[in-house]
Amino acid sequence: MSKLFWAMLAFISRLPVPSRWSQGLDFEQYSRGIVMFPFIGLILGGISGLIFILLQSWCGIPLAALFCILALALLTGGFHLDGLADTCDGIFSARRRERMLEIMRDSRLGTHGGLALIFVLLAKILVVSELALRGTPMLAALAVACAAGHGSAVLLMYRHRYAREEGLGNVFIGKVSGRQTCITLGLAVIVATVLLPGMQGLATMVVTLAAIFILGQLLKRTLGGQTGDTLGAAIELGELIFLLALL
């Protein structure tokens, strides 16, 4: 299980994980690592939260928010943001399903993808700033937001089909069992309720999961299934929705 955790951390993030820690693990086994997603999100969000706390007293809330969101993007190598941009380029092209999937595979950034990146990044910076001004404990808020975003992505894997013939997303989409889904969501909810006061954690998780479930159904109807790009989009939007629900 420890090998699987390190493999998933190396897969999702750009944190330096020695290859020997996950040596001998077959790529097809990665679907079992979905239960690690909330904890990996917790680590990435925790690092982002620490950066915010360290910079807040030195450069103020707005710049601290800017740098912690930038750090979060760098920690994942822009992996999820790239998925968000590709998804928006395809969906908002208003073409046939096959053409949408072709556009999503194009490495060039389109207008809709660029606008989506600007909107999501700017929204995160503004929401983090507002939460900090309201006295929200930012280490916990950012850590749980990332755990919620990563955990909620399982809703686009369970009982969904892969919209393409091959790709990274095929490792997870349609390969996750009901038990794994329940464990993943349960762990995300536990993290939220433990780290956030009162019923706030549970309430924000319910809002986030409901929104991502609806997103998954809309993408399924539009694309005929899910892709690795739509998983990245779900994680980014899940984080933003969770932070918005904290306001």
UniProtKB/Swiss-Prot annotation:
Catalytic activity: alpha-ribazole + adenosylcob(III)inamide-GDP = adenosylcob(III)alamin + GMP + H(+); alpha-ribazole 5'-phosphate + adenosylcob(III)inamide-GDP = adenosylcob(III)alamin 5'-phosphate + GMP + H(+)
Enzyme class: transferase
Main location: membrane
InterPro entries listed in its UniProt record: CobS
Cofactor: Mg(2+)
Superkingdom of the organism of origin: Bacteria
PANTHER family for this protein: ADENOSYLCOBINAMIDE-GDP RIBAZOLETRANSFERASE
Function noted in UniProt: Joins adenosylcobinamide-GDP and alpha-ribazole to generate adenosylcobalamin (Ado-cobalamin). Also synthesizes adenosylcobalamin 5'-phosphate from adenosylcobinamide-GDP and alpha-ribazole 5'-phosphate.
Name the UniProt record assigns to this protein: Adenosylcobinamide-GDP ribazoletransferase
